[in-house]
Amino acid sequence: VARQLLGNLDDLNEARVAFLLPAGFDYVAVQWGIWRAGGIAVPLCDKHPLPSIRYVLDDTNAAILVYSGTFDALLAPLADRDGLRLIRLEEMTVTQQTGALPQVDARRRAMILYTSGTTGRPKGVVTTHANLSAQVLSLVEAWKWVPGDYIVNVLPLHHVHGIVNVLCCALWSGACCEFLPKFDADEVFDRFGRGNITLFMAVPTIYHKLIARWNELDEAGKSALTHALSGLRLMVSGSAALPVRVLEEWQTVSGHTLLERYGMTEIGMAISNPYDGERRPGCIGQPLPSVQVRLAGENSEPVHGDSPGEIQVKGPTVFLEYWGNPAATSEAFTEDGWFRTGDLAVVENGSYRILGRNSVDIIKSGGYKLSALEIEEVLRTHPAVRDCAVVGIPDDTWGERVVAGLVVGGPVETDELSRWLRGQLPDYKTPRHYLFLDELPRNEMGKVTKKELKKMFTDQKPSEQ
């Protein structure tokens, strides 16, 4: 793969190489081939519509796009795109070329993953090879990965959770990683029943769905599954807060106390409950190896004792920069080099507990961190929408459910609006409820008061999708 990407070049020299491939061996071969050729890997989500894909290609100025023929129809409009070399996976050939591949310094940029922020549009998070190595080594040590481990992956591979926590840790350790093409509770239970799985990692939404399916089984089925789950050594939850009820119900299903951890695209994993030791409900544990964590006040002054503060992180796991956005990069760090996560926490009996998010414009739904501002920006392009505001409201399954308050200029069918939105945004960013209003709630400065909008959703019955 590396030689095919290089062509006549000696080194890709951090050229951005996007790839759109189903989870499996080909995904791994292309990702690592990009790195071996000296390129920057830009994984795309196989469930995103073309506008989302085009945005990433534009923002990174990608030189190459490697894709599976499965996506021929989706990517057809890119065929004549200037400056983009399209490589169809099925047309790649095994090369007989020999010779040295480039030496890639650990300080080079390795990957760009996209994450939503309060500026609205997704930002490209750049990690170096050294960053990725530090992230993986920290987890391998803390969670005691060994060559005999076997993990089944149900997580998306355009996200740090699936790429680093599962795939890279497994490869680094010499363990086995099996991919499921999509999440299906019965398929997951079938893999558990085979008896070779040692680890499993998922978002709270997946555990919620597994619990719901387990409750539908007869007593013999429940007993067999619980016995199979007892053979796993570790089960991890992350990417969103783990509801205590889900943790307790999963204990009943599996006999396991889920290990909850805390991380972000920008920092990898930073805090984790212990592999050995007490895992307290509602808490995320202690800093991982090589990670420095502090709580800080509004002016980034350290706070102590049981006072709440913003989680700030420093260390080799922390990303290099936001791609092409030096202003956002500068704003993300304190003057003394700590990354501002925007999450508030307290330390209780030596363990961190998350209190919430500094910004109401960040929604955590189903393991994704979504920007309300990005969704609003797209909604406002619909001809019938005069104004809008998007918020997240608590939901047992998703953590937070995306909802929208709308001011419209005439009759609007919510089904039609949702269909239109799904052509512009990934499905998981599409609001599940709409509230039609004469005007949005605002303060005296004219700013939308999103806390009041959230309350309106609890007081009224909105239209549901």
Describe the residue ranges of each PLM region.
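Gly/Ser/Thr-rich phosphate-binding loop
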Residues: W143, I197-A202, A212-R280, Q292, ...
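Conserved ATP/PPi-binding loop(s) of AMP-dependent carboxylate-activating enzymes
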Residues: Q286-S290, N299-A332, S351, L370
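AMP-binding/adenylate-forming catalytic core of the ANL superfamily
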Residues: R3, G315, L320-E321, L344-K429, ...
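Conserved ATP-dependent adenylate/AMP-binding module captured primarily in the ANL superfamily
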Residues: Q4, H48-P77, T95-Q96, Q135-V152, ...
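Conserved AMP-binding A3 loop
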Residues: A110-L137
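Conserved pre-ATP/AMP-binding loop-to-beta segment of ANL
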Residues: Q96-Y114, G120-R121, K144-Y150
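Conserved AMP-binding/adenylation subdomain of ANL enzymes
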Residues: S133-Y150, V160-L199, K209, R213-L217, ...
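Conserved AMP-binding/adenylate-forming
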Residues: A2-H48
